[in-house]
Structures are given as structure tokens and as C-alpha cells.
């Protein structure tokens, strides 16, 4: 099993900054979302 962790990232001044973890919006929405121009990116994946 591989488990992945996602975090929100934004690019400012050509540098990407990492923010809070991504949260699914609502129970039905499986897509993880970030607000205010932040993008959800895979932080790391671990093999369990």
C-alpha cells in the first residue's frame, strides 16, 4: 500500500511556498482543494 500526503503550494516571486495540508471540500468531493490560488501538490508518498 502506498500512502501519499498532499500539501498546498503557491508560487510567489518564482519560488514555491508550502502551506497547509490539502483538505477535501465536503464529504462527497474526493478532490483535495486549496483556496486563494494555492495548488494541491503531492508532498511525499510512503510505502506501507
From Swiss-Prot:
Q: Does the keyword Secreted apply?
A: yes
Note whether Amino-acid biosynthesis occurs among the keywords. no
Pfam families from the entry?
A: Toxin_20
Keywords in alphabetical order: Disulfide bond, Neurotoxin, Oxidation, Secreted, Toxin
Show the InterPro entries listed in the entry.
Answer: Hwtx-2-like
Tissue specificity remark: Expressed by the venom gland.
Disulfide bridge partners, by residue number:
4-34, 8-40, 22-45
The Swiss-Prot or TrEMBL record describes its family as follows: Belongs to the neurotoxin 12 (Hwtx-2) family. 01 (Ap1a) subfamily.
Name-wise, this protein is U1-theraphotoxin-Agm1a
